[in-house]
UniProtKB/Swiss-Prot annotation:
Organism: Streptococcus suis (strain 05ZYH33)
Protein name as annotated: Large ribosomal subunit protein uL18
InterPro entries (UniProt xref): Ribosomal_uL18_bac-type, Ribosomal_uL18_bac/euk
BP GO annotations: translation
Any one GO cellular component localisation term in the record: cytosolic large ribosomal subunit
Family: Belongs to the universal ribosomal protein uL18 family.
GO terms for MF: 5S rRNA binding; structural constituent of ribosome
Subunit structure: Part of the 50S ribosomal subunit; part of the 5S rRNA/L5/L18/L25 subcomplex. Contacts the 5S and 23S rRNAs.
Function description: This is one of the proteins that bind and probably mediate the attachment of the 5S RNA into the large ribosomal subunit, where it forms part of the central protuberance.
Keywords tagged on the record: Ribonucleoprotein, Ribosomal protein, RNA-binding, rRNA-binding
């Protein structure tokens, strides 16, 4: 008798959660969506107008301004950069899309940093 124990794929569960949430939230020109993607090595943030299908502002750990520090410290800098770039384009209010990730750690650090630097959500 063979018993197969399968471990749930956390990324598949996250993607399913993200698809479910994306059905409910959408970014407009007046209030675009602040989307987060978190990988093992980096974190990426985009301010997106879903109606027009364009990215209005973005920042990531690949930017030259973000290089030193722990991953959480880098997330704080990415939050600051994306907020500054969005505010420079006249965007002050966004809808926060955490990408199916838990609001904890790097995602929370990025969100709080973006709030401190002028984005409202």
């Amino acid at each position: 008798m063979n018993i197969v124990i399968s471990k749930p794929d956390k990324n598949k569960i996250r993607q399913k959660r993200h698809r479910r949430v994306r059905g409910k939230i959408s970014g407009t020109a007046a209030r675009p969506r602040l989307n987060i993607f978190r990988s093992n090595t980096g974190i990426y943030a985009q301010v997106i107008d879903d109606v027009a299908g364009v990215t209005l502002a973005s920042a990531s750990t690949l930017d030259k301004e973000v290089s030193k520090g722990t991953k959480t410290e880098q997330a704080v800098v990415v939050g600051k950069l994306v907020a500054e770039r969005a505010v420079a384009k006249g965007i002050s209010e966004v809808v926060f899309d955490r990408g199916g990730y838990l609001y904890h750690g790097r995602v929370k650090a990025l969100a709080e940093s973006a709030r401190e630097n002028g984005l409202k959500f």
